[in-house]
Amino acid sequence: MGSLRVSVYFLRFYAMVSIQITISQSRMCIPEKQAALFILGDSLFDVGNNNYINTTTSAQANFEPYGGTFFRYPTGRFSDGRVIPDFVAEYAKLPLILPYLHPASYLDYIFGANFASAGSGALVETRQGTVTDLQTQASYFKRVSKLLKKKLGDRGAKAFLARSVYIINAGSNDYGAVLFTNSSTHAIPNPQGFVDIVIGNISSVIQEIYEEGGRKFGFSNVGPINCFPIARMLVNGSSLDACQEEAASAIARLHNRALPTMLQKLEKQLKGFKYSLTDFYSALVELMKYPSKYGFLEGEVACCGGGAYRGDNSCGGKRGIEEFELCDNINDYVFFDSSHPTETAAQHFASLMWTGNSDFTHPYNLKQLFNM
């Protein structure tokens, strides 16, 4: 059954690539109502770009047991299967969006492109040299925009890019990289000032995409960083309430207050700018507190890893610790590894982004943006 599933996946993939090649050899033809999906961000959104850069295994997931439940092989996604953008693409009736750096990436990008890089942040300095930072991801998007202008002309490309939707997830690694690299809880002496820099970089990237023609944007905010298994392992026994009061979770909340303020400001400044913002922080805390309410059995311990909460980042045995545990039923868990959701949890978050009400997603959801 597993081999049949893989075969079907590859048949679909090669069919799409063949269509792309045919299009690239003739005139590019895009349906008038086609809305593509462009993706920027970190490991929550990365579908394998880090497979193609010189980095460390901590920033890669191209080994088992990653990818085992859906693809039946590791794809570079930090999940047992699909990640959030995969489900968003499905809901938008688009095929899976390949990583931009994949050699057979969509040649004309009529469905969009995924630039996300695991471990990256909004700041160039965050894990510099081992990831593709948000600014570089934006520069890759500009290359795509330039190609589209050659194929469609300036007017056609602008119209296509205006119909498209851009989803962005950034910030978590900027805070985590600093706070977990330094032993002192005072590693960020001016938290609000640091948040302002991160938010400023995200704003700059949004405006760059807007200048190219982008008008419809989707965002998820930063999760409760100290409540991830990888962080709770360091303070074993801390309650879910307590971990939200620790430094990284506290700065995440500062970020999450600043992000909507910035977006509202851009909405006033940029004509036609529309956005959707999903409260990933609250949605994740809700799953962790009440897993059974959403069909899970375990909300705090990871499925794959070792140590307390299975939070030692050993999943797959390729990151310096060879021994690791793998749970029996992955779908029972919110977390797959020490800091990433299972496919089932990712689908839950994607659904909130797609059709979520104002409790978690506002002022629009992604479905509304795609239909505009």
Identify the meaning behind each predicted range.
Residues 2-372:
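Conserved active-site regions of diverse hydrolases
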